[in-house]
Structure formats: C-alpha cells, structure tokens
Amino acid sequence: MLKFKFGAWAVVLMLTAFSFSACDDNDDETYNPPANITEALKQLYPNAQNVEWEMKGDYYVADCWVTGDELDVWFDANANWVMTENELDSIDQLVPAVYTGFRNSNYSSWVVTDVFVLTYPQHPTESVIQVKQGNLRFALYFSAGRRLAA
C-alpha cells in the first residue's frame, strides 16, 4: 500500500512540475516587426508612445498610446494601414449620435462589456458596443450616422 501511495504521489508531482514548465510566459520577449512596418506607424502616429508589437494572424499590430488613448494599430505585410482600434473606457465616450442610437435600440437594457471605435483608411468609422444578457453576447456595429449595422 505504501508503494502505491508513493507511486501515486510521484506521478502527481511529475504532472505538476510538467504543467508549470509548460506554462512558459514569454511576455518579457519583445517582438520587433520589419522596419517598413515601424516606419508606417511613425508616419501615421508620430507621437505614439510605449509601442509594443505583436502578430495577429497575418497582421502586425502595434499596441501604443497616442494623446492619452490606448490604440491597437493594424498593418498588413506591405506596411499598409488596415485599421485602428480604440477601446473606450465607457459608452459615454461615444459620439452623441451613436450613444443615442444605442440608447434607442432594443439592446439598451443589456450589459455593456466593451466599447470600441474602429477607424479605417478607406471606410467610415464604426463604433462597436459589445453587450451581454444571460448567456447571449453580441457585438453591435454602429455606422458613423448612428445606425445599427445589420
């Protein structure tokens, strides 16, 4: 019986040690994109500070601060600006037309979980309000004219 207990504990300890070694967190490593990508960010947002880069799929994404706002700026492999995502602290920071559009929608009583403004080079700005009610979750896209996109 003692042999079985020792063997069981040995397996538990080995699995625990393996689990911790497999959870290597590489947050300390800095990703550096190609020079044309960093130059594109400097051209678009010359005052960007505290820039941290990562890859999301095929896109280079700069997490940075510009005039007090935290932005995620997306570029393709050719250093073309794809979009900028600005996460807002509150729904109250939305432009009044979008705020009113949301308040007049069927989702106004739902819990707001996140609010973003998406800016594109060739398309109108969109506001995204993520809401939940119970197990249901939706991302509501509002056009610049306050209309809920279908």
Region spans (language model):
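Bacterial N-terminal signal peptides that target proteins for export
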Residues: 1-10
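Hydrophobic helical h-region of N-terminal Sec-dependent signal peptides
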Residues: 9-17
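C-terminal motif of bacterial Sec signal peptides marking the signal peptidase cleavage site
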Residues: 18-22
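Bacterial signal peptide processing site
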Residues: 24-27
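First exposed extracellular module after export/assembly in secreted or surface-exposed proteins
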Residues: 30-150
